[in-house]
Amino acid sequence: MTQLPILLLLISLVYATPSPQTSKKIGDDATISCSRNNTNYYVVMSAWYKEPNSIILLAAKSDVLYFDNYTKDKISYDSPYDDLVTTITIKSLTAGDAGTYICAFFMTSTTNDTDKVDYEEYSIELIVNTDSESTIDIILSGSTPETISEKPEDIDNSNCSSVFEITTPEPITDNVDDHTDTVTYTSDSINTVNASSGESTTDEIPEPITDKEEDHTVTDTVSYTTVSTSSGIVTTKSTTDDADLYDTYNDNDTVPPTTVGGSTTSISNYKTKDFVEIFGITTLIILSAVAIFCITYYICNKHPRKYKTENKV
């Protein structure tokens, strides 16, 4: 009896193939099916289990036995096309339903050699996704301008205008009346050219200063704008307020996509050797029951035939 599980385990290693994948959303129903290659043998039993150690069901024809708290309300079983295909449907998917599902066929030859048992195994990976793949895009697309002011009375806005060149994809426009400066941003420093004196200065860490909010429009994540004149400095800082964005766009119902590698806590820890041995024992019990039934039927029918023969004589 101990040789049968070892034989079935070796056969399962031979038939091992890369697992195909199917992807569904939370709340949907997922139908997983597999078909056997050996169509000449008779299927004694089929089984479904989930890695690593969770047996879902054992099925012999229309009789289905569930394990590990699985029920037909959660997982329904079907075996159409004369046991050529076995199918399960997982209803109302949750994140815990994701993982690798394995189906197995236990087959015997149609000849009198009932000791030979063939075994085929196939695996399918189920991925459960959420509905919030675009959440990060929504958060990154918004920006909230935040401004403060320093020494506005020292700024001379007469007869000058400002033109800004920024290395970010979208330009920043500052509508300060009648002054002209050119500011070029690099990665960590800001170069400012003074229109009145022609001198160039570099600010390593600019102070967060701003003009009036209604006088300019900023559409960027983080940017600094510095205008240097003869009498003062004005700097505009535009940042993205993460707290406000999460208040606006964050939804408790939307969660980043989740892919579960496939682990399920079960009441008992099963190994491949254990359930293969269970399958073998069950197969022998079924075959023994069939043999007992045939012997009983033969004995019961033998006596009436003998009685009829004696009456004829």
UniProtKB/Swiss-Prot annotation:
Localization per record: Virion membrane; Host membrane
Key word Lipid metabolism present: no
GO cellular component terms, A-Z: host cell membrane; membrane; viral envelope; virion membrane
Gene3D superfamilies found in the cross-reference section: Immunoglobulins (2.60.40.10)
Keywords: Disulfide bond, Early protein, Glycoprotein, Hemagglutinin, Host membrane, Immunoglobulin domain, Late protein, Membrane, Signal, Transmembrane, Transmembrane helix, Viral envelope protein, Virion
Modification after translation (UniProt): Glycosylated; contains phosphate and sulfate-substituted glycans. O-glycosylation is required for hemagglutination and hemadsorption activities of infected cell membranes.
Primary localisation category: virion
Inducers of expression: Expressed in the early phase of the viral replicative cycle.
Keyword Signal assigned: yes
Glycosylation sites (chain numbering): N37, N69, N112, N159, N194, N252
Transmembrane region(s): 275-295
Domain of life: Viruses
Virion surface domain ranges by topology: 17-274
Sequence ranges on the Intravirion membrane side: 296-313
InterPro entries: Ig-like_dom (IPR007110), Ig-like_dom_sf (IPR036179), Ig-like_fold (IPR013783), Ig_sub (IPR003599), Ig_V-set (IPR013106)
Signal peptide: 1-16
Membrane topology of this protein: Single-pass type I membrane protein
PROSITE patterns listed in its UniProt record: IG_LIKE (PS50835)
Subunit structure: Heterodimerizes with OPG040. The heterodimer OPG185-OPG040 interacts with components of the entry fusion complex OPG143 and OPG094. Heterodimer with C3/VPC protein; disulfide-linked.
Family of this protein: Belongs to the orthopoxvirus OPG185 family.
Function: Prevents cell to cell fusion by interacting with and directing the viral OPG040 protein on the host plasma membrane. The OPG185-OPG040 complex associates with components of the entry fusion complex (EFC) presumably to avoid superinfection and syncytium formation. Via its interaction with C3/VCP protein, protects the infected cell and probably also the extracellular enveloped virus from complement attack.
Name the record gives this protein: Protein OPG185
Species this protein is from: Monkeypox virus
